[in-house]
Amino acid sequence: LKDGDAVQGIAYVIETYGLIYNKALLNKYFELPDAEIKSIDELNNFEALKKVADGIQKNKDELGVSGAFTSAGMDASSDWRFKTHLANLPVYYEYKEDGITSSEAIKGTYLENFKNVWDLYLKDSTCEPSMISSKTGEDAASEFALGEAVFYQNGTWAYNDIKDMEVADEDMGMLPIYIGAEGEENQGLCTGSENYWCVNKKASEEDIQATLDFLTWVV
């Protein structure tokens, strides 16, 4: 955590989020005769994601799923996945394009991309769009854990909610959230921290140094 060039804190919790996916189910889709995308290596942009999701939805009965994506619940236990995490992507690409790290208001350069991803989540889902107001985070986790959906937008912290069910650990993977931005084929996973170790600059020099020595030992 920096203020200019000055280090203000060091992260002690690193978390990553994206599209958690079921490898076994995705491979079943790749093997379909009419699959437009044939391998995970080809699934590296929004256009490919849409082809895969549409194909899964079209063949959901044959694949044994209820939908490509888990339900996009909009209650408080789930809506943050989209109002915050998904929304970070269009903001990131706008800031990157403009060469800035903050602004008083976004221009909305990538709002159409945001809408396209959200529409895909709703259209190729385990539930009808009219049901999202009643769907919860627990519903989405359960749908993925029981093998009812191929994709589940969430992060590393969700592992405890989906482990030891129908999806084996070795069948879990994570893809970046693709929104159709230029160059996203090289995009990585969204990774960061909300938790940092900091040292109180108003403490005594002795305590500051002892704390820094301790943190050096810890890390």
Regions found by a protein language model. Give the residues of each.
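Beta->alpha turn/N-cap motifs
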Residues: 137, 154-159, 177, 193-195
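Short helix-initiation/N-cap motifs at beta->coil->alpha
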Residues: 43-48, 131-146
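Extracytoplasmic/periplasmic substrate-recognition and gating elements
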Residues: 126, 165-219
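Paired acidic/hydrophobic, glycine-rich loop segments that form the ligand-binding mouth/hinge
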Residues: 150-154, 173
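Short, solvent-exposed loop/beta-turn-alpha elements that line the ligand-binding surface or hinge
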Residues: 38-44, 73, 91-116, 164-166, ...
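Extracytoplasmic/periplasmic solute-binding protein
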Residues: 2-13, 17, 47-103, 149
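Glycine-centered hinge/linker elements that transmit conformational signals in sensory
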Residues: 50-55, 98-134
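A structural signal for short loop-to-beta-strand junctions that line the ligand-binding cleft
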Residues: 1-26, 184-190
